[in-house]
Curated annotation (Swiss-Prot):
The keyword Signal applies. Heparin binds at residues 174-177, 241-248. Sequence repeats lie at residues 92-113, 114-135, 136-157, 158-179, 180-201, 202-223, 224-245, 246-267. Residues 1-18 form the signal peptide. Gene3D superfamilies: Apolipoprotein. Belongs to the apolipoprotein A1/A4/E family. This is Apolipoprotein E. The gene is APOE.
Amino acid sequence: MKVLWAALVVALLAGCWADVEPESPLEENLEPELEPKRELEQEVEPEAGWQAGQPWELALARFWDYLRWVQTLSDQVQEEVLSNQVTQELTTLMEETMKEIKAYRAELEEQLGPMASETQARVAKELQAAQARLRSDMEDVRTRLSQYRGEVQAMLGQSTEELRARFASHMRKLRKRVLRDAEDLQKRLAVYRAGVREGAERSVSTIRERLWPLLEQARTRHAKVDALATQPLRERVNALGQQLRGRLEEVGSRARSHLDEVREQMEEVQAKMEEQANQMRQQAEAFQARLKGWFEPLVEDMQRQWAVLVEKVQAAVGTSPTTPPVETK
């Protein structure tokens, strides 16, 4: 009976070593995973200067900052990832980002009075769709983290190299989607800015079209009065004409000043949004790089479990294994 138990233990050890040995080529398989990452880094490199400006951009930056904070965990990373705290915090930050985006969009809509109602409705619909896509991508990030938490719990004590490679690939795809939708949202906001500028220019043009005929009529009447009236009357008409011209010039100057101010504000908003897009790409790149450090404690724990298993088998059989186990990294 003892001989049968010994044979069974030896067979079990042989099967474990057979399962562990194929893990070494997995490290070579991970090398192709680095190529998409390098390509993605080249894609986002030109926009690495994103700076938060608007409230919704600051809220989105806080969403990525929290993910970066989670990545910096070392000894307690397993406990933090396996808890619900990360998912709850990401949900709160995501809702805050969506709230700020709605508030910023409402603020822009107040400035779209001169824009045609049909154009305004179309642009608002497109912006709402872009906002929904960004929200969906952020929810995918949260869902993927929850799914990964469950997979890690199910694979404790087993090799997680394949899980790490698959999770890294998913996060790269999610990052590309979030950055792409952020760009799309910027484009929609740019259309809003163009609408504000167009409305301001149309208002100035309307003022000119309405006042110019009045000015021409005043000049015509002034010429008739000069021909028929006496000198004092001509002086009074001249004074009135000069006063009218002064007022018209003042109105035109104010309109031009307002148009210049609106253009400056729109350029400032565009610059801030471009800076925010660059910052999101830089933060996403850092998040991808730091995710790889999450699995080191799991690998060390599996190595310790393997050593304990070998010691138990050696104690049961009374002999040491002829071939040492292959460590996974």
